[in-house]
Swiss-Prot record:
Catalytic residues, chain numbering: 62 (proton acceptor)
Parts of the chain that traverse the membrane: none
Major localization class: cytoplasm
Gene: ung
Cellular compartment(s): Cytoplasm
Species name: Streptococcus equi subsp. equi (strain 4047)
Protein EC: 3.2.2.27
Record-linked HAMAP family: UDG
Protein name in the entry: Uracil-DNA glycosylase
Length: 217
């Protein structure tokens, strides 16, 4: 289901039967409708970015709800798929902040220690936030709590009001939070553009001796 270190730590935070409840939920929703991402990719963020290698968290709300978009990594789509509006704005801000990146697939960020986590890990086709409040939030809150308990600094990048509410879970003063409005077209011009999250994260990582992320890779 998840990388073993994540699993071991998360199960210490959740009620004992919570993984079983998640599996029952997944069995039901995938058997009765079209759900994204593909089931094999539901936990991809935790599989690609091991706990011990996580340096940055970028928190999304839920997966893209159109065909072939969601990969199990927040904001990412395959390179063969047009960038959705929020991702277009993320790449526009990246270009202004550091440089041009010509890929829509953000897997290389995840492989460098950027945990691309959605607060809800599944979504019904065509229904944004359709699985909100059903099963996922305690699980993904547990992920944040596990990171909060780490004794090595993590940079939490929180975009938009929903993600910024999770700041209450980040109580360990060793960590760093970068927050701004969401990259959605509805809010990007209210402070996301010009917020320079990528260079700011790298400056923090460099200062902490953790090495920079190659955001253009």
């Amino acid at each position: 289901m998840t990388h073993s270190a994540w699993h071991d730590e998360i199960k210490q935070v959740l009620p004992k039967d919570y993984y079983r409840r998640i599996n029952r939920f997944l069995d039901e929703v995938y058997a009765t409708g079209v759900v994204y991402p593909p089931r094999d990719n539901v936990f991809k963020a935790l599989q690609v970015t091991p706990l011990e290698e996580t340096r940055v968290l970028i928190l999304g709300q839920d997966p893209y709800h159109g065909p072939l978009q969601a990969q199990g990594l927040s904001f990412s789509v395959p390179d063969s798929i047009p960038a959705p509006p929020s991702l277009q704005n993320i790449l526009e801000e990246l270009a202004a902040d550091i440089g041009v990146r010509n890929h829509h697939d953000l897997s290389s960020w995840a492989e460098q220690g950027v945990l691309l986590l959605n607060a809800c890990l599944t979504v019904p086709e065509g229904r944004a936030n359709g699985h909100a409040g059903l099963i996922w939030e305690p699980f993904t809150d547990a992920v944040i709590k596990v990171l909060n308990a780490k004794d090595r600094p993590v940079v939490f990048i929180l975009w938009g009001a929903y993600a910024r509410r999770k700041k209450a879970l980040i109580t360990n003063p060793i960590h760093h939070v970068i927050e701004s409005p969401h990259p959605s077209p509805l809010s990007a011009y209210r402070g996301f553009f010009g917020s320079k999250p990528f260079s700011r994260a790298n400056a923090i990582l460099e200062k902490e001796g953790l090495g920079q992320i190659d955001w253009l890779r």
